[in-house]
Structures are given as C-alpha cells and as structure tokens.
Amino acid sequence: MALNNEFEPIDATQHDIKKFRCGKPTMDEFLHRYAAKNAKLGLSKTWVLADRQPETDKAAIAAYYTLSLLSIAPEQLNNGNGLPRYPAPTTLLAQLAVASSYQGKGLGTASLLAALMQAVKTSDNGLPTYAVVLDVLDESAMAFYQQFAFFKPLDASGKRLFVPMSVLKKQFDVA
C-alpha cells in the first residue's frame, strides 16, 4: 500500500473511480457517476486519498470528500449571532466516504478533518462562508459525527448539522 499523505483533487485519468466501494450505494454512485463531472461543471469539488500501486495505471481511492456551496435561510440560523436577514453562504460537506477495504484505520476522521481544513482554507483565501453544513445519511454516520462535539443540529430533524467557521478556526488554531 502506497497511501498518499494528503488528499488531492479527483482526476479520472489518475484515479480508479469505478472500483471504489464503501458499503453505501449512494456514496459509491456519486463518486462513480458525478464527482468528476460536477467538478468540471463547477458544481462541487471532490478530493481523494489515493493509494498508488506500481503495478496499476490508476490509483485506488481509499477515501474521498466533496465540498460545495449552500445558502442557509436566516431563520435557520440563531438570530442572536448578528447575521443579516438574508441567506448566509455556507460550505456544504456534501459527501464523505472511506472504501470498505480501508475502514477501521482512522481514515474517516482523517477525511473529515481534511475536509474541514479545506473548507477553512477556501473560506479564508477564496470565497468566505459562515459555516460548514452537512446532512447525515444514516445512524452510523450520525454516531460518527457525534464524536465531534463542535457539530450542532441546524434543523428540527437533527440530521442537518453545522459548525461555524469561527469554531473551526479555533479548533484548528487558525488566525
């Protein structure tokens, strides 16, 4: 195994996209059919953790995450935070998955932290956003995200979570 230390933008010519399997069909399908296409269209950007093998042309994908932009209506956010009364820009953590053969090795946490750091970098150096938002797929995903105390429910269902950029900057000690 020659697992990269860092995530890199998805590239269908370099990464074996079609062989990725994580045990969640919707997550597999997104990577197989939409990740590279959506990146080309400017709809989202997917980063992968590649596992390069000398005997193969394309690197296996150990994990991936996808970020996009999302506007949140002001009534969904706490009125006491000084935000204006129009939709707030946020970063959507749209996808996060670890290939089945790499699960149980800490890559879920590593992927989440990489995604959150990328969101902070993008917010600081490109397009400012108020928070990171994510939609929880199922109960196992909820258990995973609940390990990170900084995520808070954004809606009554509790399945849409968010964390303000200001909290992430403190968490990662970013000025």
Language-model features, listed with the residues they occupy:
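Non-catalytic substrate-recognition and accessory regions of acyl/acetyltransferase enzymes
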Residues: 1-105, 109-175
